């Protein structure tokens, strides 16, 4: 048994060495006086700060559990002078974000549903583009401990070997980094570099001065890290930019992000830019999402919430807005926690907040799909109404849409396929064939043969193309007085006669009219 000044949990492989000793926090049992590394006990920082007396596992059997501090309206908090200096009197306690308590107390937990069919999360072993097109992904998809061969995803090295030191070494210590202050939900100014972030991340949880988060390090051009990482097959098959980008300028860099979050990190409710779908694989640590589906009611409430001048002070889940004559709050919400090795797919438009229970490293990315084009445009309009800064929107979104129109105008069969309509035809044909073999379908005359052939659902095609054409027509009108909008139109590809090109798209749309 080690002496009381040595942590007994990691005695075989000591946590601290000469370079980390001063950065590690300790807890002492008030009964036996044994010292422990706080991180070895895996007690979240927020709980450590609330302890009056710690009892180790052995002593708690005879002396009862640890004793929390007495709660009082006059209890002291760690004053967040940075937030106060910025004029934010809401975030006064810098040990955790003010919304974390409500997040953690949210009761509906998708991980705890025992029903055969989970109403919140689609738990699977694999996911393909065909499955996505068939189901329209009405629920997020979680593949626990995903088999990389099955989902056809490749990590640069084993997930458990992807550490903050590995990332800093591969990407480079001097790489500029956007760091978010969790308490204020604002970027840290002046910015950091990756070397400084690595040192902060490696600091013991209890010794960190503030909670900070990194969620926007794009790594697709990093040689041995990003370039050797292969996104899941479903993402590569459905990514709209992959299909349509036919441009000399660099494509939007949103495909591969490295997210580095410390314990207690919290990102308030948001929708990913332009309603992009998201893939998310956890290398280490864990993440908890609180999610709401993109129903018309929820999106309407979300838009109003974003427009509130005191939005940062308001918990989205409690926000009330009149919808169709009734006072409504967001509905259909649930929590889900991801563990190392999990692959998570968030469909287009989902409203979500994210909490980090323990230090975590994640690789993920965003992608547009033809299937979700109407939702992408719906969220794009919400971003305009709520005045989301250009920095936080999908880069070159309008150029992508012009290129999308050109690609599918010249590849109309692919338009059917990418909407899942060719599968619809094959499925209908198969059903009719099976029924015919059972004698349930009479032989048709030659006159009716063509009429009875299975046809694609034109309403799906029409709705998708209609919202695209409408958006491009509106964008073209804006381009007449807005140089930035004008420069996003790929005239070198579609020609300088933009009205003529739009007329061709309109004719195609008219052909699809149900």
From Swiss-Prot:
UniProt-recorded name of the protein: JmjC domain-containing histone demethylation protein 1
SUPFAM superfamilies: Clavaminate synthase-like (SSF51197), FYVE/PHD zinc finger (SSF57903)
Residues spanning the signal sequence: none
Comment on bound cofactor: Binds 1 Fe(2+) ion per subunit.
Lineage: Eukaryota, Fungi, Dikarya, Ascomycota, Saccharomycotina
Gene Ontology molecular function, alphabetical: histone H3K36me/H3K36me2 demethylase activity; zinc ion binding
EC number of this enzyme: 1.14.11.27
Cystines in this chain: none
Family under the similarity heading: Belongs to the JHDM1 histone demethylase family.
Zinc finger (PHD-type): 4-62
CC cofactor: Fe(2+)
């Amino acid at each position: 048994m080690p002496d009381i000044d040595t942590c007994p949990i990691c005695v075989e492989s000591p946590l601290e060495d000469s370079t980390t000793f001063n950065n590690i926090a300790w807890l002492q049992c008030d009964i036996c006086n044994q010292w422990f590394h706080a991180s070895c006990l895996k007690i979240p920082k927020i709980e450590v700060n609330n302890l009056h007396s710690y009892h180790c596992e052995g002593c708690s059997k005879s002396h009862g559990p640890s004793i929390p501090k007495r709660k009082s309206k006059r209890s002291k908090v760690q004053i967040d002078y940075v937030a106060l200096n910025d004029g934010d009197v809401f975030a006064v306690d810098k040990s955790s974000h003010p919304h974390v308590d409500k997040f953690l107390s949210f009761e509906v937990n998708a991980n705890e549903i025992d029903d055969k069919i989970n109403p919140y999360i689609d738990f699977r072993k694999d996911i393909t583009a065909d499955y996505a097109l068939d189901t329209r992904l009405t629920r997020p998809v979680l593949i626990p401990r995903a088999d990389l061969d099955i989902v056809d995803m490749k990590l640069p090295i084993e997930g458990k070997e992807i550490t903050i030191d590995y990332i800093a070494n591969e990407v480079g210590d001097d790489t500029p980094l956007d760091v978010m202050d969790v308490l204020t939900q604002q970027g840290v100014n002046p910015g950091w570099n990756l070397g400084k972030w690595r040192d902060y991340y490696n600091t013991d949880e209890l010794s960190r001065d503030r909670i900070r988060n990194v969620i926007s390090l794009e790594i697709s051009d990093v040689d041995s890290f990003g370039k050797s990482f292969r996104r899941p097959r479903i993402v590569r098959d459905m990514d709209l930019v992959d299909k349509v980008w036919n441009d000399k300028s660099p494509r939007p860099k949103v495909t591969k992000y490295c997210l580095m979050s410390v314990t207690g990190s919290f990102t308030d409710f948001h929708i990913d830019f332009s309603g992009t779908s998201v893939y998310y694989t956890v290398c280490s640590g864990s993440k908890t999402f609180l999610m709401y589906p993109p129903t018309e009611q929820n999106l309407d409430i979300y838009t109003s919430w974003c427009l509130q001048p005191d939005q940062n002070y308001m918990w989205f889940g409690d926000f009330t807005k009149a919808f169709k004559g009734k006072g409504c709050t967001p509905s259909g919400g649930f929590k889900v926690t991801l563990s190392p090795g999990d692959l998570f797919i968030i469909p287009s438009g989902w409203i979500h907040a994210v909490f980090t229970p323990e230090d975590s490293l994640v690789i993920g990315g965003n992608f547009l799909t033809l299937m979700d084009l109407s939702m992408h445009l719906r969220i794009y309009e919400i971003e305009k109404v709520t005045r989301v800064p250009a920095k936080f929107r999908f880069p070159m979104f309008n150029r992508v849409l012009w290129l999308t129109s050109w690609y599918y105008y010249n590849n109309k069969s692919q338009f059917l396929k990418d909407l899942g309509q060719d599968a619809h035809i094959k499925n209908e044909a198969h059903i009719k064939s099976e029924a015919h073999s059972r004698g349930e379908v009479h032989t048709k005359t030659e006159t009716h043969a063509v009429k009875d052939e299975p046809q694609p659902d034109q309403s799906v095609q029409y709705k998708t193309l209609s919202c695209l054409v409408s958006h491009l027509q509106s964008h073209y009108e804006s381009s007449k007085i807005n140089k930035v909008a004008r420069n996003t139109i790929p005239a070198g590809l579609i020609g300088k006669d933009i009205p003529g090109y739009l007329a061709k798209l309109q004719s195609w749309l008219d052909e699809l009219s149900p």
